[in-house]
Amino acid sequence: VQQWGVAMATATKVITQLRNEGLVSVTPGVGTVVAEVSPTRRPRLAQRSPADSGATAERIVEAAVAVADAEGLAAVSMRRVASEIGVATMSLYRHVADKDALVMQMMNAALGEWEEPDAPPERWRERLEVAGRQTWELFRRHPWLAPAMSITRPQAVPNALPLAEWVLAALDTRGLDMGTTFTAYITLFNYIRGTAFNIELEAEAQAQTGIDNEQWMDHQEPVLTELLTGGQFPTFSRLIQLDYDFSLDRLFEFGLQRLLDGLAMMVGDNQ
């Protein structure tokens, strides 16, 4: 980065894109290197014929989501999106007022991927489990989505309502007042969203360092072991002996079940 005068943010975006397309890979102790064998590349936007080469709201949002999925929301700009679909930047403004409006449409498109199961569970807990896992998968597919959404200043995104309605309807059968029901829904959503924040942060860290979280922990183990040699933290020291495999997916599922355990106790349901 210093040698070539490239900003860290720019280098991070480029490396992330190359990794997503299978052109580079992470080598332990070395960093990011050119991949020996090119895996299946990340799907790119379909090439359009001259007849349908004009900008449309759908194409603009599709291109913006693809950029954000690959490189993060910071990489999305009107100029970048116009370049992706092969049109002049100013032509986008006939369909989207500005980047803030574009991000709103991106969120709406991503949340619109949620579909109610064909055979939804009847019991409230099973329904919330399904909703929680579906929401987690949405954030997995679109790492930028969790940071883009707000709990304290919620955006009016139409496609957020079907999922919210589905969860609220399940909780509404438990005899809670509407305020408590809504608070339970927000708590569930914010837990999933908060955990999902780490997805994009980890992707950025991998791009910057060239190592994944497991390799990073391996590098930290000698330092941590030295910190624990004094015997001041005997309980924590026992963790060093464990072959603990950290996983965001496992962390999410553990927290989801404990949160639902708490709701079950609150509504007096031992299902």
Regions found by a protein language model. Give the residues of each.
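Hydrophobic alpha-helical connector segments
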Residues: 117-156, 162, 185
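C-terminal peripheral helix-coil segments that are non-catalytic and often amphipathic
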Residues: 201-271
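HTH-adjacent hinge/linker in prokaryotic transcriptional regulators
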Residues: 16-70, 100, 105, 109, ...
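Short coil turns linking two alpha-helices in DNA-binding domains
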Residues: 7, 85-89
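Residue cluster at the C-terminal edge of the helix-turn-helix DNA-binding motif
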Residues: 3-4, 20-22, 70, 84, ...
